[in-house]
Design a protein with these regions (language model features):
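N-terminal secretory signal peptides that target proteins for export/translocation
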Residues: 1-14
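Intrinsically disordered, low-complexity sequence elements enriched in Ser/Thr/Gly/Pro
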Residues: 5-8, 37, 47-49
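Short, surface-exposed polybasic-aromatic patches that bind anionic ligands, especially phosphate groups
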Residues: 41-336
């Protein structure tokens, strides 16, 4: 916008000052001069290049365009400690693994709560002091990770269409008329606001889960336009924003911190890949993925869908994690 105004100003010098003032006002109204900030005031836009559009789910935009989940990091600098981080994550001996597939109990489901969904009580039994209080708009048929009788993480992810807020819980159980969970977090999808420092969420890193999931419809449309989520077995007792929490007592500086972002190298040859795997690998070069939890090494999270083609996804299992690089880290937080 400023470049256009500058050209006109050179043509008509008499109105140059007025044009500069007008363009500045337009930029303020457009929000161009107000980058997303972390709790400490650090600009999150520095993590990558913002864009003009954002992913959508259930009629809701998934965070603003300058949010870290939506930024292009294909040209971001590589961290000088990248090789050591990769070694700690067993990159040379581990391949990617899609933690989702066609089985209805595989992956993490997302529930869309229509605008008329009632808000019901939500009680927390493990981390109430780090949870956002209820009520939550959880329908009685809210989908649970692994199914209603699952014994695993039992994540519940709900997009409330009435206010475009994201509600995520861990170890979730229906008790009628409401729910109980180990902990819960609420994210305003129109805001860049992070959770308080040292607070967890339904994810160990204090991050939202839903924006990170590989979703069937977006893959079928040919493009994933956001960062993804992955796990490794051991992490450092540290995090960087947008993460707000760590889940480790390890102080080795070569161990990966929560919120670390990795990217598939631009030089990695994807010409032999097809279908769903090709779409995922292409996005990993552009948006990468955040380290979000302790778990199996290099497992990528996806949404539940019986339409996934497992044979297609299995191509990812041939990709060595050594083909990734760690993006330049920002400030690390270690005092929780």
């Amino acid at each position: 916008m400023l470049s256009i105004c500058s050209r006109v100003a050179r043509i008509v010098p008499a109105v140059a000052a007025l044009l500069v003032l007008a363009c500045a006002a337009l930029l303020v109204l457009a929000g161009c001069g107000a980058p997303a900030l972390a709790p400490d005031g650090t600009s999150l836009a520095a993590l990558g290049r913002a864009r003009s559009d954002v992913p959508k789910l259930g009629g809701c935009s998934i965070f603003p365009s300058d949010n870290p989940w939506n930024t292009d990091i294909s040209e971001s600098s590589v961290d000088p400690n990248s090789a050591n981080y990769l070694a700690a994550m067993n990159a040379d001996t581990t391949n990617l693994h899609p933690d989702f597939g066609h089985d209805k109990h595989y992956g993490i489901p997302v529930t869309l709560a229509p605008k008329k969904t009632p808000f019901v009580p939500m009680k927390f039994f493990s981390y109430p002091d780090q949870s956002d209080p209820g009520p939550y708009p959880f329908p009685k048929n809210t989908q649970i990770e692994g199914g209603k009788n699952a014994t695993g993480d039992r994540h519940a992810l709900v997009v409330g269409e009435v206010n475009c807020h994201l509600y995520e819980t861990y170890d979730t159980h229906y008790v009628g008329p409401g729910w109980r969970a180990a902990n819960g977090a609420v994210f305003d999808l129109s805001s860049d606001k992070l959770r308080p420092d040292c607070w967890t969420s339904a994810d160990a890193a204090g991050l939202p889960i839903t924006p990170a999931l590989v979703k069937y419809d977006e893959v079928q449309n040919g493009e994933i336009d956001h960062a993804m989520r992955f796990t490794v077995a051991t992490t450092q007792a540290a995090y960087q924003h947008p993460a707000t929490h760590y889940a480790s007592s390890i102080t080795n500086p070569n161990e990966p911190p929560m919120g670390m972002r990795v990217r598939l190298k631009a030089s990695f040859d994807t010409s032999g890949f097809t279908g769903e795997s090709l779409v995922i690998l292409t996005a990993l070069k552009k948006y990468g993925m955040f380290l979000a939890d302790n778990g199996s090494d290099w497992y990528i999270s996806g949404a539940t869908a019986t339409r996934w083609n497992d044979n297609d996804l299995d191509q990812l299992k041939t990709v060595s994690a050594s083909n990734f690089e760690v993006i330049q880290l920002g400030q690390l937080y270690t005092d929780c």
